Regions:
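C-terminal substrate-binding subdomain of Rossmann-fold SDR/epimerase-dehydratase oxidoreductases
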Residues: 1-122
Length: 122
């Protein structure tokens, strides 16, 4: 299975950039043919993802390396609703605010591991 992991700083950057460029209302909005991007209360939805899916076992390996610990792995069959792979399409975000998350998984996990070590769970 593959998943698309995104570092938190990239998510924050994407959200902040969107706050700086909100959708604007359209005086010609037609409620019979609604377009949420130009409604009286306009909004836009964006995927904020890294767009680089990684095998879950590779993710676990990188996390183990970053934390200096081996995970206890328990393999389960796919659950109803699971998909084999996911990846974010950030093209709309890039077009709207000129931003694409870019923190490599390895770096994000190293930073996460440092944070976990600084703020351990009880």
């Amino acid at each position: 299975m593959c998943r698309d992991f995104t570092y938190i700083d990239d998510i924050v950057e994407g959200v902040v950039r969107c706050l700086d460029k909100p959708a604007t209302p359209d005086a010609a909005f037609d409620p019979l043919a609604p377009n949420p991007a130009t409604a009286a209360a306009p909004h836009r939805l964006f995927n904020i993802g890294n767009s680089q899916p990684v095998e879950l076992l590779r993710f676990i390996e990188l996390l183990e390396n970053a934390l200096g610990r081996e995970a206890i792995k328990r393999f389960e069959p796919m659950q109803p609703g699971d998909v084999v792979a996911t990846a974010a399409d950030t093209s709309a975000l890039e077009a709207w605010v000129g931003f694409r998350p870019c923190t490599p998984l390895e770096l994000g996990l190293e930073r996460f591991a440092a944070w976990v070590k600084d703020y351990p769970f009880p």
